[in-house]
Amino acid sequence: MPISDINAGSHILVFPYPAQGHMLTLLDLTHQLAIRNLTITILVTPKNLPTISPLLAAHPTTVSALLLPLPPHPAIPSGIENVKDLPNDAFKAMMVALGDLYNPLRDWFRNQPNPPVAIISDFFLGWTHHLAVELGIRRYTFSPSGALALSVIFSLWRYQPKRIDVENEKEAIKFPKIPNSPEYPWWQLSPIYRSYVEGDPDSEFIKDGFLADIASWGIVINSFTELEQVYVDHLKHELGHDQVFAVGPLLPPGDKTSGRGGSSSNDVLSWLDTCADRTVVYVCFGSQMVLTNGQMEVVALGLEKSRVKFVWSVKEPTVGHEAANYGRVPPGFEDRVSGRGLVIRGWVPQVAILSHDSVGVFLTHCGWNSVMEAVAAEVLMLTWPMSADQFSNATLLHELKVGIKVCEGSNIVPNSDELAELFSKSLSDETRLERKRVKEFAKSAKEAVGPKGSSVGELERLVDNLSL
């Protein structure tokens, strides 16, 4: 009898963190669990309901929403419920505010005739582990980061390395227990970790959350063993159990790849249809990052000088960004490159763009979702990590030889001539090792999510585990 039949009816609570890069992949995992006959309740605050609406429509009998209001926090302006709308200094406040859902969520559980038997929640919601323990159920940590990055995050909070010279931002922090012994200058470590203050209530709450992640029943990762085998094995060794599930790449189901992009999706894809295979550079720095005007100028100059075809996804700057000289596309640039490139403001159908045969190179900030989407689509990456886990992700890409370094850091301004040369050479040089390697990993990614693939096997093992 198939595992999915055995487990029909098991009720799971899924709790995503309200940030685009965190929510979408956990919702893609939720879809995979739903088609395996699990009953799922997704917890969101009211203003995040539209993000899960397509999933609710696709699974009307097995997936439902639990709406709980976001508890107030002095650092979060009224009406804001998603990280993308937060002031720059309020990221940790969202983690703390969501922690105040402990009692309302416990009350909801106790009033259910058929309460969930397990919780799957984002690694920024570590407090749900304590709730699960109180309720006598299992909590699984969902990591929107890969296995190497998660190894670094767990190592930071478990061992708490410190600088010898507290004034030296470049001091190297070493991770000798992690395979290949990565090391990073202090400034490249997680900003959440770097801002930890011993004894500060919010800092201690966040630290406790990550330690609770380590203590949780299992870890679910958007990666696949063929890409990160050594780091998946390391996590199992560090955690002392094998409940680490590499279930990626988690991508939107079927033809949903363009639906996330809004009204501009069809225009972009139609334009790409006019381009030859592997002739287009895609430029995107994620849903949160806004470049300085100086960086915008250099990227624009690099694209212009290279004479390559391109799609450049630009996050719409706020009034505050504009006042601080962030996010401006150089005047006249779009006219000068008309017909050769597109500048798209706002959200774009990234999976569909990367999957298009015309796209051959991706200038990326190395956010993990972007990495997984590019690997799956067989697109060579030019790396410009800027924050958080992006430096670990870039390390992995260089280690596996599927990425070429451009620069690193959110303050650096690269040379436009060097950038132009990278754009043109990375598209034209079919013999380079990185292109061969990305082709091999794309094949592995496809096999991982195919019949009898490693990630499908891990999904089935997870479904089986959820219902024990």
From Swiss-Prot:
InterPro entries: UDP_glucos_trans (IPR002213)
Alphabetized UniProt keyword annotations: Transferase
Enzyme class: transferase
Binding residue positions for UDP-alpha-D-glucose: 287, 347-348, 365-373, 387-390
Top-level taxon of origin: Eukaryota
Alphabetical list of Pfam families matching this protein: UDPGT
GO molecular function: UDP-glucosyltransferase activity
Entry's EC annotation: 2.4.1.-
Family according to the record: Belongs to the UDP-glycosyltransferase family.
Function: May glycosylate diterpenes or flavonols in leaves.
Record's protein name: UDP-glycosyltransferase 89B2
The species this protein was found in: Stevia rebaudiana
Lineage: Eukaryota, Viridiplantae, Streptophyta, Embryophyta, Tracheophyta
